[in-house]
Amino acid sequence: MANLQSKSSSAKRKRRHFRVRAKINGTTSVPRLNVFKSNGHFYAQLIDDVKQKTIVAASTLKMTGLKSTSNIAAAEKVGDEIAKKALDKKVTTVVFDRGGYLYHGKVKAFAEAARKAGLKF
C-alpha cells in the first residue's frame, strides 16, 4: 500500500525550489536574486550562476535597530539593502528566485521593497 502520510513543509519547499531552479538561471548581466529564511533571520544574495559567484549579499545578521530579525519589517530592510548594494555594482535587472517559498508574507515584502528601491524583476 502507498505511503499516505503527507510530506513535511521543508521537503515540499525543496521540491518547489528544485523545480524553479530548473527554469531560471542567473548570468553576469542578469544575476539571480536568491532568498533564504531561517527561524531567526532573513538572507538574500545576487548570484552569477555562470561564474558560480555571489555578487552581493545582505541579511539581518548584522543589522541593528530592528525589533525582530525575522519579521516582515526585517525582510523589507534586507530588500532595501540588497537593492542599494546591487545598484552600487551597476546591476539593475535580476531574476527572482524565491527559494521554493510561497510568494506571500516576508518573501513578498522583500520583493516589493527591492523593487521600490530600484531593482527590476
Curated annotation (Swiss-Prot):
Q: Name one Pfam family in it.
A: Ribosomal_L18p
The record's keywords, sorted A to Z, are:
Ribonucleoprotein, Ribosomal protein, RNA-binding, rRNA-binding
The record's section on SUPFAM superfamilies has: Translational machinery components
Q: Does the keyword Secreted apply?
A: no
GO CC term, one of those recorded: cytosolic large ribosomal subunit
Q: Tell me the GO BP annotations in alphabetical order.
A: translation
Mind listing the GO molecular function terms for this protein? Answer: 5S rRNA binding; structural constituent of ribosome
Q: Which NCBIfam families match?
A: L18_bact (TIGR00060)
Q: What does this protein do?
A: This is one of the proteins that bind and probably mediate the attachment of the 5S RNA into the large ribosomal subunit, where it forms part of the central protuberance.
Q: Please describe the quaternary structure of this protein.
A: Part of the 50S ribosomal subunit; part of the 5S rRNA/L5/L18/L25 subcomplex. Contacts the 5S and 23S rRNAs.
| Database matches in HAMAP family | Ribosomal_uL18_B (MF_01337_B)
Assigned protein family: Belongs to the universal ribosomal protein uL18 family.
**Protein name, UniProt field:** Large ribosomal subunit protein uL18
